Amino acid sequence: LNLQFPAGWENAKKIKYSQGYTSPSPMNYVGSAPLTEPEAQALYNFTLSHNFRIMLTYHTQGKEIYWQFQNYAPKDSYSIGMQFAKASGYTLAGVPYESSFAGYKDWFLQRYSLPGYTIEAGLR
């Protein structure tokens, strides 16, 4: 569901299809278009209807904090991310290219130019 957002969705589709994720699966399937799944639509609409100043998403793969999307790095994003990293012991990191499109954080950064983070809270 995380690869359902309109922020580089076509790039995500190309990458994930080349990796063999061409049909519904537990991870890495982008769907047939952005925002086709009800859960993604609900999160999208919920976000549009509120005035968030910062956004956090949680995943469970890696003890890292992702803070950018392509060239989108809103003011103070890095310093806020470093505070999260210091408090959590996680690494503030750039997103690997093959995972850097169509996520909720990506869309939030692109749409609002406000700080947004994906916190990878578990182990790989």
Each language-model region and where it sits:
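Active-site/substrate-binding loop(s) of hydrolase catalytic cores
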Residues: L1-K75, T118-G122
